[in-house]
Amino acid sequence: MIIWLAELLQPYFSFFRLFEYLSFRAILSVLTALGLSLWMGPRLIKRLQLLQIGQVVRNEGPESHFSKRGTPTMGGVMILAAISITILLWANLSNPYVWAVLAVLMGYGAVGFVDDYRKVVRKNTDGLIARWKYFWQSAIALVVAFALYAYGKDTAATQLVVPFFKDVMPQLGLMYIVLTYFVIVGTSNAVNLTDGLDGLAIMPTVLVAAGFAVIAWATGNVNFSQYLHIPYLPHASELVVVCTAIVGAGLGFLWFNTYPAQVFMGDVGSLALGGALGTIAVLVRQELVLVIMGGVFVMETLSVILQVGSYKLRGQRIFRMAPIHHHYELKGWPEPRVIVRFWIISMVLVLIGLATLKVR
C-alpha cells in the first residue's frame, strides 16, 4: 500500500524513493510487526482474561503443565493481525506471491480459530473434529497449489531444487500440486505439534522465517540466483517483506510467550504460521531446505509418528511421551532447558540450510 503512495509522491518528494528499496521496506516490516505485537499484547491478554479464554490442559499430560491451566490462549490472533497489517502496509500488493501467503495465513488462521473456540469457549477438549480440520486444511492447500501451478506451469517456478547438487532441478509437472499440498499441510501440523512449551514453537518459526528472507532475496535477485545456481524467480524477492513481518510479529509475541508464558498462541497461531512457512518454501522452491531448517518441527512430528506406530505394531512406546519435548520433560529436564536447547538446535539447522545455497 505504502509503495503505491510512494510512487505517486516520488516526483514531488525525493524521500519517498527510499520505499523502492527492498532492504528499507524489510527493516520497516520487522519494526512495524514488532511494534504492533508489543502494543497489542497487553491489551489482548487483558481481554482474554476478562473473557476467561484460558488454556485447556489434558489430565494425561505432564504434571508440570497443570499450572498452565487457565493461561490466556488464542494469542495467535495478535500475531496474524500484526503480520497482515504489516504486509498490507509495506509489501507490493501487485505481487501474487504475497497474496498466496496471505491466503494460507488467514485461511489456516480461521481453521485454528474455530478449533480454539470449540476448545476454550465451548469447553470441548477435542476442538474441531479432526476430519473437518484436515478437510479445510486440505481444501485451502489444494486451491493455492492449483493456482500456483496454473500461474507458473512448466517454468522455474515448478522445478524441484535439490540441495547440494548444482544442476539437479527436475520439472515436477502435476507432481508440483501434490508436493505443494503435503508441504503446506505438513508444515502447518508440524508447527502445531511443536507448540507445547512456552516459546518452543515461535522462536524456531522466527529463525526459519529469517532464513527464508535470505533465500527469497537471493532467489529474486538475477545475479545472486545465477551465482548460487538456484532458479531466478522475480516475484520471490517481495517475500522478504513477508518473512520479516513474521520475524517481527513472532519476536513481539515471544515477549509475552517466553517462560513463564503470559499467553499461548493456540491453534489459530500455530496452524497459520506453519502453513505460511510451507507456502513460502514452495514459492522459493526450497521445500527440501525447509526439512533441514525446520528440523525441530520435523523431529517433533516424527516422534509422534514413531510413538503411535510402535505402540500399534509392538504394543510398546519408544518415548515416555510424544511429542518429544514431553519426553525430555519427563526425564527431569526443566522446561526452560528443553526450550532453549531446541532453540539452539533450530539456529544451527537454519545456518546449515542457508549453507546449502553455496555448498553444491
From Swiss-Prot:
The keyword Membrane applies. It comes from the Bacteria. GO terms for cellular component: plasma membrane. The chain crosses the membrane at residues 21-41, 73-93, 94-114, 132-152, 168-188, 199-219, 236-256, 263-283, 288-308, 338-358. It is found in: Cell inner membrane. Keywords: Cell cycle, Cell division, Cell inner membrane, Cell membrane, Cell shape, Cell wall biogenesis/degradation, Magnesium, Membrane, Metal-binding, Peptidoglycan synthesis, Transferase, Transmembrane, Transmembrane helix. It catalyses: UDP-N-acetyl-alpha-D-muramoyl-L-alanyl-gamma-D-glutamyl-meso-2,6-diaminopimeloyl-D-alanyl-D-alanine + di-trans,octa-cis-undecaprenyl phosphate = di-trans,octa-cis-undecaprenyl diphospho-N-acetyl-alpha-D-muramoyl-L-alanyl-D-glutamyl-meso-2,6-diaminopimeloyl-D-alanyl-D-alanine + UMP. GO terms for molecular function: metal ion binding; phospho-N-acetylmuramoyl-pentapeptide-transferase activity; UDP-N-acetylmuramoyl-L-alanyl-D-glutamyl-meso-2,6-diaminopimelyl-D-alanyl-D-alanine:undecaprenyl-phosphate transferase activity. It is a multi-pass membrane protein. It holds the Pfam family MraY_sig1. Its EC number is 2.7.8.13. One of its GO terms (biological process) is peptidoglycan biosynthetic process. Its cofactor is Mg(2+). Pathway: Cell wall biogenesis; peptidoglycan biosynthesis. Catalyzes the initial step of the lipid cycle reactions in the biosynthesis of the cell wall peptidoglycan: transfers peptidoglycan precursor phospho-MurNAc-pentapeptide from UDP-MurNAc-pentapeptide onto the lipid carrier undecaprenyl phosphate, yielding undecaprenyl-pyrophosphoryl-MurNAc-pentapeptide, known as lipid I. Belongs to the glycosyltransferase 4 family. MraY subfamily. This is Phospho-N-acetylmuramoyl-pentapeptide-transferase. It comes from Vibrio vulnificus (strain YJ016). The gene is mraY.
